[in-house]
Amino acid sequence: MQSVIADLKQQEIKPLLRFITCGSVDDGKSTLIGHLLYDSQCLAEDQLADLMVDSQRYGTQGEHIDYALLLDGLAAEREQGITIDVAYRYFDTEKRKFIVADCPGHAQYTRNMATGASTADAAVVLVDARKGLLTQTRRHSYIVALLGIRHVVLAVNKMDLVGYDQETFEAIASDYLALAAKLGINQVQCIPLSALEGDNLSKRSARMPWYVGPSLLEYLEALEPADVDLAAAMCLPVQWVNRPDSQFRGFTGTLAAGRVRPGDAVVVLPSGCVSRVVRVFNGDTEVHEAVAGQAVTLTLADEIDISRGDVIAALDDPPEVADQVTAYVLWMDDTALLPGRRYWLKLGARMVAASVSDIKHRVDVNTQEQRVAQRLQLNEVGYCQLSLDAPVAFVPYARNRVLGSFILIDRHSNATVGAGTLDSGVHRASNVHWQPLDIDHVARARIKGQTPKVLWFTGLSGAGKSAIANIVDKRLHALGYHTFILDGDNVRHGLNRDLSFTVEDRVENIRRVAEVARLMVDAGLVVLVSFISPFRDERQLARERFAANEFVEVFVDVPLAVAEARDVKGLYAKARAGLITDFTGIDSPYEPPPHPELHLRADQGTPEQLASQVLSFLGVEAN
């Protein structure tokens, strides 16, 4: 028992290094890690036995051990001989503990690679000695640089297949060093090796006497990760408000930067409230000081409203606070990122609604050239400006990986669709304020004697939206209501005349109309909006511009065949003939509302009858 305790204590004091392996398909990443695990004697007897069996069943090395099978855990991976998901493995040597992430090489799994790289101290970039630098090598190296990994190993693998040729290695190393310099990666160690044969893997190989550097494991054991910057200003993202009883109120989280002591002056962001640290706890133990990386609980001298997601920071050097920011975004979803579309942005423990207001450029990760883009597709990287519904406290990613990184979440599926690194705040965001006005929307509604709201008619072209809205408008006007119609066709003659019918411009079309409708509701009007508005996200964006009782979604539902048969304007015929592109229902989707306030079956009634249903819903007696 004493020996076990001694071993555990020894493990506690060993330094930990997190690293990833990345590169192109079949460069040997899984084989390299599997061989390291084998050499480090970290495998149990049953794992070794399973490896022998699996090598015969799935292996690609004949009668020899297939080390890659230690990493390729998914059935699909073993059957295809590729890595799909990020595989994390732990091993240790006498000098150090390691957590290694084996990242997939296929281009469609670049998002998985970015996940593995987000917490890494170092990256091992594998290159097949027979092929040299490939597209995916450049892509992964760009992401390594983007995510701030400062230590990179170029592992030129499969040297056994080129006869351990020195010139081959040096040519590849020269090409990669030029790429690394272009990407701003300054610390690169180039190592020739054979993951299958074990050359220069755990120890130096006699087969390459011309190489005088360390083996891969020797380099990783000696590598010193970037130290935590204790001189940086203190920042604590609050993860939890700890209130076990009425006598204690603490704020818990992991210090993202600097150090904290009792008596330190702090500011709470984004509120800007100022206080002083009274007590500092590390776990249940009260301490005189805590440093970055430690989980702490702070108590403050003042009763301040602090919630999960707020940041407690040093008063003399706080993080920036902004509701508009610029950032590099790696898109990770099959559905493209579109400017104006709404997502959840999660920065630490803080969650706010956000949209990309502008894609300034897309980065060609193969050449690092900047290209014009109106959307980001899966695995693409763009430099974007984001607009947030509420201000957030952040530090640029180049200075702090914790307070400078975020993810984007789909508001319907809750899937992570993007990851980003913050660059800066947009300064004008903090200089624009609401001008207080004496006459508000309540006063304007009162003088008109009505409850303002927006009726948002949505449906396919030819469903009858405009006809129904027009009848409702006439009847409300006859009853003395103050109304206005915003019709999709009419608005495109003026306000939105610069917009086309691409997905991107459709999103902007609805954003503008929603803002105009909001102004009209503030003026006390009943606004009838008649737009196809095919995308659920944009209709949700419009809904969020209004109070809960101000927005009525009216789904004018009609089968596509019925709408196409009507075809009053001849648009369906032109779309079928290819004369019109991006036409809703033909080559552009319509996403039906899942829960509209009012569902009209336009094929089961006349426009007059359907208009009566709208008025009945509103509780209005028509003439």
UniProtKB/Swiss-Prot annotation:
Adenylyl-sulfate kinase: region residues: 451-623
Enzyme Commission number(s): 2.7.7.4, 2.7.1.25
Segments for region (G1): 23-30
Keyword Kinase: yes
Residues that coordinate or bind ATP: G459, L460, S461, G462, A463, G464, K465, S466
InterPro entries named among the record's database cross-references: APS_kinase (IPR002891), CysN_GTP-bd (IPR041757), CysN_II (IPR044138), CysN_NoDQ_III (IPR044139), G_TR_CS (IPR031157), GTP-eEF1A_C (IPR054696), P-loop_NTPase (IPR027417), SO4_adenylTrfase_lsu (IPR011779)
Example GO molecular function: sulfate adenylyltransferase (ATP) activity
Catalytic activities: sulfate + ATP + H(+) = adenosine 5'-phosphosulfate + diphosphate; adenosine 5'-phosphosulfate + ATP = 3'-phosphoadenylyl sulfate + ADP + H(+)
Entry's family note: In the C-terminal section; belongs to the APS kinase family.
Role this protein plays: With CysD forms the ATP sulfurylase (ATPS) that catalyzes the adenylation of sulfate producing adenosine 5'-phosphosulfate (APS) and diphosphate, the first enzymatic step in sulfur assimilation pathway. APS synthesis involves the formation of a high-energy phosphoric-sulfuric acid anhydride bond driven by GTP hydrolysis by CysN coupled to ATP hydrolysis by CysD. APS kinase catalyzes the synthesis of activated sulfate.
Known partners and oligomeric status: Heterodimer composed of CysD, the smaller subunit, and CysNC.
Record protein name field: Bifunctional enzyme CysN/CysC
